[in-house]
Swiss-Prot record:
Function: Bifunctional enzyme with both catalase and broad-spectrum peroxidase activity. May play a role in the intracellular survival of mycobacteria.
Any Pfam family matching the protein: peroxidase
Protein residues bound to heme b: 278
Catalytic activity entry: H2O2 + AH2 = A + 2 H2O; 2 H2O2 = O2 + 2 H2O
Assembly and interaction partners: Homodimer or homotetramer.
UniProt modification remark: Formation of the three residue Trp-Tyr-Met cross-link is important for the catalase, but not the peroxidase activity of the enzyme.
EC number: 1.11.1.21
Species this protein is from: Mycolicibacterium smegmatis (Mycobacterium smegmatis)
Molecular functions (GO terms): catalase activity; heme binding; metal ion binding
Keyword Metal-binding: yes
Protein name (Swiss-Prot/TrEMBL): Catalase-peroxidase
PROSITE patterns registered for this protein in UniProt: PEROXIDASE_1, PEROXIDASE_2, PEROXIDASE_4
Location of the active site: 114
InterPro entries in the cross-refs: Catalase_peroxidase (IPR000763), Haem_peroxidase (IPR002016), Haem_peroxidase_sf (IPR010255), Peroxidases_AS (IPR019794), Peroxidases_heam-ligand_BS (IPR019793)
Length: 740
């Protein structure tokens, strides 16, 4: 800070100076925030690539010992003792945040639900798997108001069990224990979620810059932007008052179906979660919501991480304000029963207002008067419902489902148990990752189950490699097929990958990105090799091994003898074990590694490349190495030559980087205006190469150019091959959770 500017004259941290002079900062304001307050190059160039999402959860910010392994540590947990401690917390009301009805169970259910409920199936991001509810923005979402208190109530438990229990596991396990303590039988629980130590900044939560804004995520009639799932910024699912606060139950049902569907739930699962969840507890709106203080991230230091301080009355208990709605659904709010549906269908309902002015519903003609207990004082009142609750009654599909449960509560219990388990575990990956004594024996289609594979001897691997090498399949076919299979992996929810051999099944066999006609030929050839070999090898292993053969051939053509690491043991799933609708979300709409950009992309191709690399769990150097290598291996979608900057395609050379950075080439946009570029000889004007935005970004973006320069250097040829093989193997093995 300049010495002639008194510190008291500076704007507060987090605020920008608004009186920017003409011709000032190109970002539109006159004073950039310091780095410690969030200032960055993005303030100057807001449209630049965010390379930091390729540096997720680095070791340098992890306070645990370098050799600490949570998945081993959690297996030392005394789960019975943990359960008892959570139960004790639930039954011990604290004056600083008194328990509704003397039981924190409903609060813990909401905490677990809102942690897991951020998951969206389109990109696999969100969910409870990393304990993100502790960090911004989720810890400060309006829909998560008061969940800061739930986590603070559990701090003594976390403190006691230390590193053997992650916050990610504790947050959702507390909700599971709460259900069971109130009489519900869950389907079980799996431990194994590892905490991270910084917010996930690779998740796009929406375009809005104000809480509860809903003006920018919809187009047309009510088309919600992908990959978003919630209807408003800062909500988990839908607006409980109805769309945009309009108390229309039928319109609410439309939002519910869309939102829960984007979170991987069908109609039965959706109805079960709403009915089951709203069997317990209450909402809080007994006062003027506009008087509530700022959320945790904006609260003053003395609040020590808590937010939403309420100055009205005691500020807690009967005076608590969370959503502004004041609803208790049933007369048994801490007990599992069928009373939610009995009350929903046992009354006609009329619109009313909460003390905070929110739209909610009460029984007509004073129905069920004095039947529902007050949470913090003697006396009783009537039940209430949300607009989103009445949606279950007015929507014909939801009504058919829930009316049956009214007469068959055992079916509701079964469906809620399954849906709740799915909610908590959807982002954990396959059942082989489930840990602990409460893992259920049952499995479900949504878990993408894969039969166990077989081990292979060194001799068997050698024979298979020889058969593949002599099969007539080209380096391009071998490498591209393995890449198509393995690169479906998503580190976000641990779905996809080569394991399972689903590249030969629908829907993957028919995806445009996979070039179905050519892929079908390669699949047939692999099936012939599989049969002719006489070896009990899975199709999945064969595809990866074939990719390795292609890489080894390409390295040899570049003058290097390498052996690409191969770990057998992949299994083959069947079509019956594959949920076609669910797997459709894994279809790549863009794959910059193969210069593929599908129709209707919402972002430029280079941004899609970074996003895909992030989902694959790649670092920026790994991404750079793979793009450069795959270009010279000639694996582009459709056989295009964009970015194939070599006269030796099929050889694993550094030619992509050398020729991209060669200043004798001048680049200009193609007159076809199709997002491609033409590289011409500066001296003669003769065309030399063509490229895409993904190709040119490695020369244009300063960070990527720095990486490209490393591999273009004369002494990097061997290093490039070594680094490519390492990055390739990482992708091939990304879904091998059975391999250390």
């Amino acid at each position: 800070m300049p010495e002639d500017r008194p510190i008291e004259d500076s704007p507060p941290i987090g605020e920008a100076q608004t009186d920017a002079p003409a011709g000032g900062c190109p970002a539109g304001f006159g004073r950039i925030k310091p780095p410690v307050a969030g200032g960055s190059n993005x303030d100057w160039w807001p449209n630049q690539l965010n390379m930091k999402i390729l540096q997720k959860n680095p070791d340098v910010i992890n306070p645990l010992d370098e050799d600490f392994d949570y998945r081993s540590a959690v297996q030392n947990l005394d789960v019975d003792a943990l359960r008892a401690d959570i139960v004790e917390v639930m039954h011990t009301s604290q004056d600083w945040w008194p328990a509704d009805f003397g039981h924190y169970g409903p609060l813990f259910i909401r905490m677990a639900w809102h942690a897991a409920g951020t998951y969206r199936v389109s990109d696999g991001r969100g969910g409870a798997g990393a304990g993100m509810q502790r960090f911004a923005p989720l810890n400060s979402w309006p829909d998560n108001a008061s969940l800061d208190k739930a986590r603070r109530l559990l701090w003594p438990v976390k403190k006691k069990y230390g590193k053997n229990l992650s916050w990610a596991d504790l947050i959702v396990y507390a909700g599971n224990v709460a259900l069971e303590d109130m009489g519900f039988r869950t389907a079980g629980f799996a431990f194994g979620r590892e905490d991270r130590w910084e917010p996930e900044e690779d998740v796009y939560w929406g375009p809005e810059q104000e809480w509860l804004d809903r003006t920018k995520r919809y187009t047309g009639e009510r088309d919600l932007e992908n990959p978003l799932a919630a209807v408003q910024m800062g909500l988990i699912y839908v607006n409980p008052e109805g769309p945009n606060g309009n108390p229309d139950p039928q319109a609410s049902a439309i939002d519910i179906r869309e939102t829960f569907g984007r979170m991987a739930m069908n109609d039965v699962e959706t109805a079960a979660l709403i009915v089951g969840g709203h069997t317990f507890g209450k909402t809080h709106g007994n006062g003027d919501a506009s008087l509530v203080g700022p959320e945790p991230e904006a609260a003053p230091l003395e609040e020590v991480g808590l937010g939403w301080r309420n100055p009205q009355g005691t500020g807690v208990g009967k005076d608590a304000i969370t959503s502004g709605l004041e609803v208790t659904w049933t007369h048994t709010p801490t007990k599992w029963d069928n009373s939610f549906l009995e009350i929903l269908y046992g009354n006609e309902w009329e619109l009313t207002k909460s003390p905070a002015g929110a739209n909610q519903w009460k029984p007509k003609d004073n129905g069920w008067a004095n039947s529902v207990p007050l949470a913090h004082e003697d006396g009783k009142t009537h039940p209430s419902m949300l607009t989103s609750d009445l949606a279950l009654r007015v929507d014909p599909i939801y009504e058919q489902i829930t009316r049956r449960w009214l007469d068959h509560p055992e079916e509701l219990a079964e469906e809620f148990a399954k849906a709740w388990f799915k909610l908590l575990h959807r982002d954990m990956g396959p059942v082989t990752r489930y840990l602990g004594p409460e893992v259920p024996k049952d499995t479900w289609l949504w878990q993408d189950n894969i039969p166990a594979g077989n081990d292979l001897s060194d001799d068997e691997v050698a024979k298979l490699k020889e058969l593949i090498a002599d099969s007539g399949l080209t380096v391009s076919q071998l490498v591209s097929t393995a890449w198509k299979a393995a690169s479906t992996f998503r580190s976000s929810d641990l779905r996809g990958g080569a394991n399972g051999g689903r590249i030969r099944l629908q829907p993957q066999l028919g995806w445009e990105a996979n070039e179905p006609d050519e892929l079908a030929q390669v699949v047939r050839k692999y099936e012939e090799i599989q049969k002719a070999s006489g070896i009990n090898v899975s199709f999945a292993d064969l595809v990866v091994l074939g990719g390795n053969v292609g890489v080894e051939k390409a390295a040899k053509a570049a003058g290097f003898d390498v052996t690409v690491p191969f770990t057998p043991g992949r299994g083959d799933a069947t079509q019956e074990e594959t949920d076609v609708d669910s797997f459709a979300y894994l279809e790549p709409k863009a794959d910059g590694f193969r210069n593929y950009l599908g129709k209707g992309s919402d972002l430029p191709a280079e941004f899609k490349l970074i996003d895909r690399a992030n989902l694959l769990g790649l670092s920026a150097p790994e991404m750079t190495t793979l793009v450069g290598g795959l270009r010279v291996l000639d694996v582009n979608h459709g056989g295009t030559k964009h970015g194939v900057l070599t006269d030796k395609p099929g050889a694993l050379t550094t030619d992509f980087f050398v020729n991209l950075l060669d200043m004798s080439t001048a680049w200009k946009p193609s007159p076809a205006d199709d997002g491609t570029y033409i590289g011409t000889d500066r001296a003669t004007g003769s065309p030399k190469w063509t490229g895409t935005r993904v190709d040119l970004v490695f020369a244009s973006n300063s960070q990527l150019r720095a990486l490209a320069e490393v591999y273009a250097e004369d002494d990097s040829k061997e290093k490039f091959v070594k680094d490519f093989v390492a990055a390739w193997t990482k992708v091939m093995d990304a879904d091998r959770f059975d391999v250390a």
